[in-house]
Amino acid sequence: MRKTVSLGDILLYIYDFAVIDARMYMLRADGAALIIDPNENAALLPDLEGVSRAFVYLTHEHYDHISGVNWLKSKLPCDVWCSEICASRLGNIRENLSKTFPFLFLQDKEKYDYVRKELKLPYTCVADHTFAEELRTIWHGHTLYARKAGGHSPGGSLLLLDGRLLFGGDSLLGNGLELKSLGADREAYCTEVLPYVHTLPSETIVCPGHGEITTLGELLPVIEAYITA
């Protein structure tokens, strides 16, 4: 799947991961690309025409959100950013869940066989730049603000673009799975994720790691109904 969504002056490209409903996002500006949670997806390549360098951001360390890092680096120069904790776990096949990824498909033989045969597992990659608590920078006229946000995973973080577009990874899903992963931490979620997103306007657009784009106003009541139950 590949689709584009126009968000005012921003054209957002959305791609899925072949075997699981995980999202890779891309924005273009001035011959550059901002790519969030890359996977190995041939549909991305034509959209990278004219791009000389990519700013790559990882919302957390789980395999389905990092699986395209090495592939992307083989295609063009990249600067890969993530939290320090995320970076420390990218090289551990247990902590990045690539060792156990095939087990997600034990009930679907076709997908299980595909994963075991076609995907490069187990998998590791390396980040080029990290931040401890927060990152503030300008990317081709767009403001980027990232902050550490554990809960779903120890290395989780949130990325806010221009104060209105929030890439939440698996921290903001609305399907009850935010705290169902190995290493999930309810206390961290309630102290690092929820207080921050409550400071943002309800019309903030949320681009989740799985599922469809929504707004904080629509998503937060759903999440809080089961997180704080």
Predicted segments with their positions:
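Active-site HxH/HxHxD metal-binding segment of metal-dependent hydrolases
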Residues: 41, 45-136, 221-225
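Metallo-beta-lactamase
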Residues: 33, 136, 143-228
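Short Pro/Gly-enriched beta-strand edge/turn motifs at strand-loop
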Residues: 5-12, 114-119, 139-143
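Conserved beta-strand hairpin/beta-sheet module of binuclear metal-dependent hydrolase folds
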Residues: 2-49, 158-169
